[in-house]
UniProtKB/Swiss-Prot annotation:
One of its GO terms (biological process) is positive regulation of fumonisin biosynthetic process. Induction: Expression is controlled by the global regulators for secondary metabolite VE1 and LAE1. Expression is increased under histone deacetylase (HDAC)-inhibiting conditions. The gene is FUM21. This is Fumonisin cluster-specific transcription factor FUM21. The lineage of its organism: Eukaryota, Fungi, Dikarya, Ascomycota, Pezizomycotina. GO terms for molecular function: DNA binding; DNA-binding transcription factor activity, RNA polymerase II-specific; zinc ion binding. Disruption phenotype: Impairs the production of fumonisins. Abolishes expression of FUM8 and FUM19 but expression of FUM17 and FUM18 can still be induced. Keywords: DNA-binding, Metal-binding, Nucleus, Transcription, Transcription regulation.
Length: 672
C-alpha cells in the first residue's frame, strides 16, 4: 500500500437525510509535505508543492492522482498558473486594463482569512498595459542596445530591472559563463585568462570552477526567493468562517473595523475623512442594499481592511485562525469592480484606491490591475493637472478630494514600480501641485501623507534615471570612460542626498544610525512595525539608487563601482539588523516588510556567492577559505554572520508562514 487512505467528505449532509455521504479516496501526504510539516491535500502534484514550486514526491506511484483535485489549492481556491507567454491585451486608449474574466470568476475564494487572496485574487485573467508590454519593451531595448548576437535567449525581464541587480538574469541559460557573469556583477574571467563577452563564452572544460548544474541551481534558488509570497500555514483545525455574514453589519462592529482602519497612520485615513466613513456606515445600517455601487464597494473594502487588521491582532487571535471574514467582505467589493470602470466617478476612484491599498498590503499580484483601473478613471475624468481639476470641480472640497486621490495613487504606484521593475502609468505632470493635507490631518500629528508623497517623488526620480540608463551599465558593455562613471556618480549623489533629506525629516530620524532594542521593546506592535517599515524603506531605496552602478566593471580604479557595492551591502545589512524585530504577524499585516527582507537577503547571498566563485576561478585555496569570512562590515561583523541572520530569520518565519527557508539555507551553504 502506498500510504494511508484518507476519506474526505464532499458535502455535509444533515443526520436525518436518507442519502449517505459520498466519499472520495485520497492518498496520504507527499514526502515533501511530510518533511516540511505542512498540510497536504494528497494530489499529484499537491497544493503545497504547486504553491512552493517544488517537486512533489510520493513513496509509491501505484495510485493515480485525482484529476479533479490537482487544480485546487488551499480552501478550495484555484491555484494560480504561471503564464507561459505574454499576449498583447485589449487595452483602452488610456493604457488601462483588459479583463478577460468576470469579477465573480476572479473572486472565488472561501478562506477564512485575508491571505487566501494571495492565491485566489490572482486568478483574475486581467493584465495591465504595463504588465503586458513590459517584457517586450525591455527585451527590445536590451537586444538592440547590447552586442549579444542573434542567438541570445531572454527568459526574464530586462537586465535593467530596478531591484534585480546582481540576481542571475537567465540570459541564454546554457551559457554558464553568462549566468555567473551576471550573478557576480563583474568579469570573473579577467584574472584567469582572456576576457570574454556574454555572446562569446569560454569552453566549460577549460575552467573547472564553473558547474552548469550548480549555477542553474543558484539561479533557481534566487528566483524562488524573489518571487514566492508568504502564505499562512493552515492549522489542522482552523476556525470555520461564520455562516451568517449579515451579523457583521451591526453598527458596533462596523465602528470597530473603521477604528482598525484608522490605526494605520499611512493607510486609508490619509485618503478618507472619518466623518465620511461614518456617513457610509450609517447608510449601510439604515438602507442596506439600497445604497449606490460606489458606497457599497468603499464600505466593503474598508470592512475587509478592518477585519484583516483585527484578525492579526496578537492579543486576540492566533495566526491562521481568522475570526472576521475579511475575504468575504472583499469578495463583495470585487463583484462591483467592473461597474466602477464602466462608470468612472470621483467616489468610484476612491473605492478603487481603497481596494488597491488592501491588495498591496496583503501582497496580491492583482495590485497592478487595481492601479491600472485607477489610472483609467483618472484619464476618463480628465484629472490631468491642477488646472483640469479646478475646472472640473467648482467646490473647493471636491477639488481637495480629487487632488488627494491622485496623490494617493501616485504614492502607491511609484514605490511599487521601483520595487517590481514596472513601467509607471501616472506621469509627474499629473501632480503639478503640492499634496494637500491628509484627510484627517491634525496639527498635533505627523502628516504621513505628505511624507509618503515626497518619498514617491524620489522613487520617480530613481525610476527616470534607471530607465534613461544613467545609473550604470551591464558587465558586457565595453568602453566606459571616466566621464560616464563621473556622470553616474553625480546622479547617485544627488538622489542619495534627496533620500537623506527625507530621512532626516522623519519624526524618529535619530534612530537610523543604530537600532536600539529598548526603544522597540517600549513601543507598541503598530509603532514598531511602522518604524521598521520606514527604516527599511529608506535602505531599500539606497539599494535601488546604487544598484545600477554596482553592476559595473571595476576597471581603471572603479572607485564609483566599489562605493556603490559597499553602499548596497551596508543597506542590506541594516535591513537584516532590523529583521530581528520583525514577526510573522508583521509580515502578514504589511507584505512590504517581507519584500525588504528578501531584497537584503539576495544582496548578501549574492556577494558571498560571488566571492566564493571568484575564489574557485582563481584556484587560490587560501582565498577560498578566508576571503569571505574575514571581510569586515561597517557594523563590526563579518558578512557571513549576516548569512546566518538571514537563515535564522527565514527559519523562524517558517513556523507560521510558508517562506523559502530551504532555498535560503542552500544559498548559505553554497557561500561557505
Amino acid at each position: 500500500m502506498a500510504g494511508s487512505i484518507v476519506f474526505v467528505t464532499d458535502n455535509q449532509i444533515s443526520a436525518n437525510s436518507r442519502h449517505k455521504p459520498r466519499f472520495r479516496r485520497r492518498r496520504g501526504a507527499c514526502e515533501s509535505c511530510k518533511r516540511r510539516k505542512v498540510r497536504c491535500n494528497g494530489t499529484n502534484p499537491c497544493n503545497q508543492c504547486q504553491k512552493s514550486s517544488i517537486e512533489c514526491l510520493y513513496s509509491s506511484s501505484s495510485w493515480k492522482a485525482n484529476d479533479g483535485d490537482t487544480e485546487r489549492g488551499p480552501s478550495g481556491s484555484p491555484v494560480q498558473h504561471t503564464r507561459g507567454s505574454l499576449t498583447p491585451p485589449q487595452t483602452s486608449p488610456y493604457g488601462g486594463m483588459a479583463c478577460n474574466g468576470s469579477a465573480e470568476e476572479s473572486s472565488r475564494f472561501d478562506g477564512s482569512d485575508a491571505h487566501s487572496l494571495l492565491m485566489s485574487l490572482s486568478n483574475t485573467d486581467c493584465t495591465t498595459n504595463t504588465e503586458a508590454t513590459e517584457m517586450s519593451q525591455w527585451q527590445n531595448w536590451f537586444v538592440s542596445d547590447l552586442p549579444l548576437g542573434s542567438d541570445v535567449q531572454l527568459t526574464g525581464t530586462s537586465d535593467e530591472s530596478l531591484t534585480d541587480w546582481l540576481d542571475p538574469q537567465l540570459v541564454n541559460p546554457a551559457d554558464t559563463a553568462a549566468i555567473m557573469q551576471t550573478l557576480s556583477g563583474e568579469d570573473l574571467f579577467k584574472s584567469s585568462g582572456p576576457s570574454y563577452g556574454m555572446s562569446e563564452p569560454p569552453s566549460r572544460d577549460s575552467d573547472p570552477g564553473f558547474n552548469t548544474a550548480r549555477n542553474e541551481q543558484i539561479a533557481g534558488f534566487i528566483q524562488k526567493l524573489r518571487s514566492q509570497r508568504p502564505f499562512v500555514l493552515r492549522d489542522e483545525n482552523p476556525e470555520a468562517p461564520p455562516g451568517n455574514i449579515r451579523g457583521f453589519y451591526d453598527a458596533k462592529f462596523i465602528s470597530q473595523c473603521f477604528d482598525a482602519c484608522d490605526a494605520d497612520p499611512e493607510g486609508v485615513r490619509v485618503l478618507l475623512e472619518r466623518k465620511s466613513m461614518d456617513l457610509i456606515a450609517d447608510e449601510i445600517t439604515k438602507y442596506a442594499l439600497a445604497v449606490d455601487t460606489e458606497t457599497s464597494v468603499l464600505f466593503h473594502s474598508l470592512m475587509a481592511i478592518g477585519c484583516h487588521s483585527l484578525n492579526l491582532d496578537q492579543g486576540h487571535r492566533a495566526i491562521g485562525k481568522g475570526k472576521y471574514p475579511a475575504s468575504k467582505f472583499f469578495k463583495e467589493a470585487l463583484n462591483a469592480r467592473q461597474h466602477l470602470r464602466d462608470s468612472p466617478s470621483l467616489g468610484g476612484l476612491q473605492a478603487i484606491l481603497t481596494m488597491a491599498y488592501f491588495s498591496a498590503r496583503v501582497g496580491d499580484d492583482s495590485t497592478s490591475s487595481f492601479l491600472a483601473d485607477a489610472a483609467f478613471c483618472v484619464q476618463t475624468l480628465q484629472l490631468h493637472n491642477a488646472g483640469a481639476i479646478e475646472q472640473k470641480y467648482n467646490s473647493f472640497l471636491e477639488q481637495q478630494v480629487a487632488k488627494r486621490a491622485l496623490w494617493f495613487l501616485y504614492s502607491l504606484e511609484k514605490p511599487r514600480c521601483l520595487a517590481q521593475g514596472l513601467l509607471p502609468l501616472i506621469h509627474d505632470d499629473f501632480v503639478d501641485y503640492d499634496p494637500p493635507p491628509s484627510a484627517n490631518y491634525s496639527t498635533s500629528e505627523v502628516d504621513w501623507f505628505a511624507i509618503n508623497a515626497r518619498f514617491a517623488r524620489i522613487c520617480s526620480s530613481i525610476i527616470k534615471e534607471r530607465l534613461g540608463c544613467k545609473l550604470g551599465r551591464t558587465p558586457s558593455r565595453r568602453g566606459k570612460d571616466r566621464a560616464s562613471e563621473y556622470s553616474a556618480s553625480s546622479v547617485i549623489k544627488r538622489l542619495e542626498s534627496l533620500l537623506e533629506e527625507w530621512r532626516d525629516d522623519l519624526p524618529f530620524a535619530g534612530d537610523f544610525d543604530a537600532t536600539r532594542s529598548d526603544e522597540f521593546a517600549a513601543s507598541t506592535c503598530a509603532e514598531r512595525r511602522h518604524r521598521i517599515k520606514c527604516l527599511n524603506k529608506y535602505w531599500s531605496a539606497i539599494i535601488a539608487t546604487h544598484s545600477g552602478q554596482a553592476r559595473g566593471v571595476a576597471e581603471d580604479g572603479g572607485a564609483g563601482v566599489r562605493l556603490s557595492r559597499a553602499r548596497c551591502i551596508d543597506a542590506a545589512q541594516a535591513i537584516l539588523q532590523n529583521s530581528h524585530y520583525v514577526t510573522s504577524t508583521d509580515i502578514l499585516s504589511d507584505i512590504s516588510l517581507y519584500y525588504y527582507i528578501t531584497v537584503a537577503t539576495r544582496v548578501i547571498m549574492t556577494v558571498v556567492i560571488r566571492d566564493r566563485f571568484a575564489s574557485d576561478i582563481t584556484g587560490d585555496p587560501v582565498q577560498k577559505n578566508t576571503a569571505t569570512r574575514k571581510r569586515e562590515t561597517t557594523h563590526g561583523r563579518s558578512i557571513m554572520s549576516y548569512v546566518g541572520i538571514a537563515i535564522g530569520l527565514f527559519s523562524r518565519l517558517s513556523l507560521d508562514i510558508d517562506v523559502p527557508v530551504d532555498e535560503v539555507t542552500e544559498l548559505g551553504k553554497l557561500g561557505r
